[in-house]
Amino acid sequence: MPMQVGAVQTCRGSHTHSVVSGPDADGKIIVYNSGTSSIRDEEELAGCFDSPGDNRTALFRTDVIEIPLNNPSQAKIVKSPAVFADEETGVLAGLWRGGDHGDQTQRTSRTDECHDITVFPAANLAAGACSGNGILFDITDPYNPQR
């Protein structure tokens, strides 16, 4: 019978968990979390920010979770990289910022989260369905996915 052995609270909840690697030599598994909910209040979970212009925002990020096999109750977020940031400018909203696509089209929301992430460890790639964008990530270093 399955039994819960741990839990990790995230700022945007959890839609999909993707096992990226592991266990490694240290007995740890790396998981990416795709959160799609609104951001929790900081009073509910410390470190959750949603203030306009605050670069600490939980938007535009994917959580990297480390799970030690010898004690899964100690699983934790070890990084939350801003995977949508523009590499040249550093602007977090580096992809679609939302808006109208032209006459007789719909308005769409900004790209600030991934609905699903599928990983291909043998190729060091992950593919994300991210707010209407198909995105590839280099996961050569699973702790630091790069768009």
Feature annotation, model-predicted:
Residues M1-R147:
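Feature marking well-ordered beta-strand scaffolds used for ligand recognition
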